[in-house]
Design a protein with these regions (language model features):
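Active-site-adjacent "subsite" loops/lids of carbohydrate-active enzymes
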Residues: 40-43, 49-69, 129, 133, ...
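Bacterial signal peptide processing site
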Residues: 22-24
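Catalytic domains of carbohydrate-active enzymes, especially glycoside hydrolases
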Residues: 69-95
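Post-signal peptide N-terminal segment of mature Sec-exported envelope proteins
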Residues: 26-44, 49
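C-terminal motif of bacterial Sec signal peptides marking the signal peptidase cleavage site
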Residues: 17-20
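Aromatic- and acidic-residue-enriched segments that line the glycan-binding/catalytic groove
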Residues: 96-111, 146-157
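The substrate-binding groove and active-site-proximal loops of carbohydrate-active enzymes
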Residues: 53-65, 105-121
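Bacterial N-terminal signal peptides that target proteins for export
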Residues: 1-10
Length: 157
């Protein structure tokens, strides 16, 4: 009787082992890996809106020097507060805050659509240079569909 019990237990154990090893279910294991090296860089950015003079320039028609001073003030603030990127709106309403052969100069920059800053400078070029001097990436923000904003005054022909 004991022999029969031992034999039955041995056969059952072998069958159980065979069945357990032949399962069709996939098993997943979770492992934790130690992360070494550098951490991915954070994108700490600020949007700088130009439509309706929301952030820059503070109003249309400022002198070139006033526009530059305000831009430097914003970039210094971002640098002081550890931002590493700025997103500058350069095409607020079918116009441009940079030299363009396709779009007129922005009303929000000079107070008259189509009028270049005087004395002349390219605001986008200025922003890129000043941002990079502070270790800040500059990204452009284009509004491809806004034809006109209610604060944009008259549209040039």
């Amino acid at each position: 009787m004991i022999r029969h019990f031992i034999r039955a237990t041995a056969v059952s154990s072998i069958l159980l082992l065979i069945v357990a090893c032949s399962t069709t279910q996939k098993t997943t294991t979770t492992s934790t890996q130690k992360v070494t090296g550098s951490v991915m860089k954070e994108f700490r950015a600020a949007w700088i809106a130009t439509v309706a003079n929301i952030n820059w320039p503070s109003k249309p028609g400022l002198s070139t020097e006033e526009q530059k001073r305000e831009a430097i003030e914003l970039l210094d603030f971002l640098q002081k507060h550890h931002f590493n990127a700025a997103i500058l709106q350069v095409r607020p309403q079918c116009d441009a805050l940079y030299k363009s052969d396709l779009e007129p100069w922005s009303y929000y920059l000079t107070g008259k659509q189509g009028q270049a800053p005087s004395p002349y400078y390219d605001p986008l070029e200025f922003w890129v240079e000043e941002a990079h001097n502070r270790g800040i990436e500059l990204h452009v923000w284009l509004n491809p569909y806004r034809a006109h904003h209610k604060d944009g005054k008259e549209i040039s022909e």
